């Protein structure tokens, strides 16, 4: 379906599925396509809170980019993933899922032993 008529919505779903199955290169291709082909009017809806909300697709793809980064190397890419997720928040300050992910990643950072 994506090959016949590629669009950001299908690219998002494919990228999300590929992240879950460990195909990070495939997900990156879909994310790159999505970022390049998302204008400010296309939005992604999220329902993980009581009140559903929408963010620009570019923020949604940036969020997925952060997930790819952390899945590449969970120990060494925490700061890089947080930086990417902060980019998503800069695009959409109301992006609750990005905020939750940043908090979870900050909690995974090793504490400095004295």
Annotated model-derived regions:
Residues 21, 72-75, 109:
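Structural motif corresponding to the intra-repeat A-B loop/turn of tetratricopeptide repeats
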Residues 10, 43-44, 61, 98:
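TPR alpha-solenoid repeat register
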Residues 1-4, 37-55:
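Flexible helix-coil transition and linker loops at the boundaries of alpha-helical arrays
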Residues 7-8, 16, 41, 58, 67-70, 94-95, 104:
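Residue-level recognition of tetratricopeptide repeat
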